[in-house]
Amino acid sequence: MKDELFKQSPKKQFEFDKSVASVFDDMINRSVPFYRENLELCGNLLAKILPINASICDLGCSSANFLIFLANLRKDFKLFGVDNSASMVEVAKSKAKAYGLDISFFETNLCEFDFFVCDVFVANYTMQFIRPPKRQELLDKIYKNLNSKGILIMSEKILYEDAFLSKNIIELYADYKEKQGYSKFEIAAKREALENVLIPYSQKENLNMLEKAGFKKIESIFKWANFETFIAFKD
């Protein structure tokens, strides 16, 4: 379905409810620059470097796009998805079933999730929705539950510290969304709905959190304007 949720002024803050879940795939493909290309980059990298039967847990898996891509790359992967939205988990399960894929899903708040040890944790555009006081604690749990040589892939919308640059990058991003078919009204309405829901950090703040959690080797593997993907290794 096409995302037309913000053709009218929002009546509430943004949340991943049934209305969002029903149009999520269209929304994210039109709202996150190079979403598919970045997903494929991360998936192909993991398929290339991970051992047989590696376990991968997608934290904030939404509609399971990344997990489905991984499942089709390598049949030996053990795949898990976690999301706090019942509607999103329902969509994810439905898609996985339609493709005949064995993926386990958990519907729970990430801050309350009973973590288990994995080779990889993925947090694509997830941390930005976690309340700031809880982010470090969550990253600490991720690090603790990674196997030796474990990997975290984390994608985030980021802030620029320079006000002039930040203003112009934000305007370029708005231009991008217009080119994807969103009107100026829709862009403004969604921005209003996301106020105090999506809270981005700067690149430096994200790197500091990862380092504080214990990660020693951290690299940026993708960036477009105010979107960036980090890969962090436990050892």
From Swiss-Prot:
| Enzyme class, broadest EC rank | transferase
Q: Under which EC number(s) is this enzyme classified?
A: 2.1.3.-
* UniProt keyword annotations, A-Z: S-adenosyl-L-methionine, Transferase
Q: Name one GO molecular function term.
A: S-adenosyl-L-methionine binding
GO biological process: what's one of them?
Answer: tRNA wobble uridine modification
Is Transferase a UniProt keyword of this protein? yes
Membrane-spanning parts: none
SUPFAM superfamilies on file = S-adenosyl-L-methionine-dependent methyltransferases (SSF53335)
- A Pfam family (short name) is Methyltransf_25
Residue positions annotated to bind S-adenosyl-L-methionine are: 35, 60-62, 83-84, 124, 191
Q: Fetch the HAMAP family from UniProt.
A: Cx_SAM_synthase
UniProt-listed NCBIfam families: carboxy-S-adenosyl-L-methionine synthase CmoA
The UniProt subunit note reads as follows: Homodimer.
| PANTHER family with a match to the protein in the record | CARBOXY-S-ADENOSYL-L-METHIONINE SYNTHASE (PTHR43861:SF2), TRANS-ACONITATE 2-METHYLTRANSFERASE-RELATED (PTHR43861)
Function of the protein: Catalyzes the conversion of S-adenosyl-L-methionine (SAM) to carboxy-S-adenosyl-L-methionine (Cx-SAM).
The protein's name in its UniProt record:
Carboxy-S-adenosyl-L-methionine synthase
Name its species.
Campylobacter jejuni subsp. jejuni serotype O:6 (strain 81116 / NCTC 11828)
